[in-house]
Amino acid sequence: MRNHQLMEMLKDQLDHEEHETEVYARKIRETKHSVAKLVFAKLMRDSMQHADVLNCAISYLATSQYEVLAPVNETREEMLRLMDMEEKALRLFSAASNQIRDPHLKLLLTMLAFDEEQHYALLRYVLENFIEKKEVIKA
């Protein structure tokens, strides 16, 4: 995919995410059930986060240069400590959700487990690509 096509696709998706944020905000206002309201709130926050990521990707792609990686001032040990915290939370929420029968509570605990799994993966990415590996990446 050419950079121009990718840029257009990212911009289109950014518009979509911004629209979704508005839709979910409306659904939060209109919904009375606490679990459904929480789900819509999470979806709204995720859409907002997706917009942030898309804006970063658009900026990153627009530079068309080698990015000079600024140092990430974290130690390997600190990253491993954070990863351990996320892994413990993942195990806790996964085990708890396996013991729950109520579908709404099971959904909430499963959402938390999924988020903890993503957090672990993101921390691992930072560790591997910004702390342990010190090379320049072409945009």
Q: How should each PLM-predicted stretch be described?
A:
Residues 1-139:
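Non-heme di-metal
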